[in-house]
């Protein structure tokens, strides 16, 4: 597969019907990665992570539900923990508003049906009234279920 790198972060998977066209994510930027060095599995996991970030910026809870497992829990920078539905409710009602998300220096690892995507999130957001740009490094876990990468809790 031939990949073309545009604007430092946009991958167009030529010959695959633009399957991984990161430029469709208008509120998500990738920095510090050469996607042409990723294999198909790594690229698909990174694409799913970027797709989730775009859904966050659009408050597209239906897409978020497609990507996130039902038993997922979220831990905020403050330490507050929420179930998937509690978190999605806050996104839907605007308590959490994401304007743009940068994915800096992502590292993708795939082992069978499990994948990790580790990166520094640069979130421009209004989180419960605290507006600004927030930087957080984290690892996101995905499990391949029926051919799709689904965000899951950290495996124990």
Model-identified regions with their sequence ranges:
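Bacterial N-terminal signal peptides
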Residues: 1-8
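Short beta-strand edge/turn micro-motifs at domain boundaries
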Residues: 14-27, 135-156
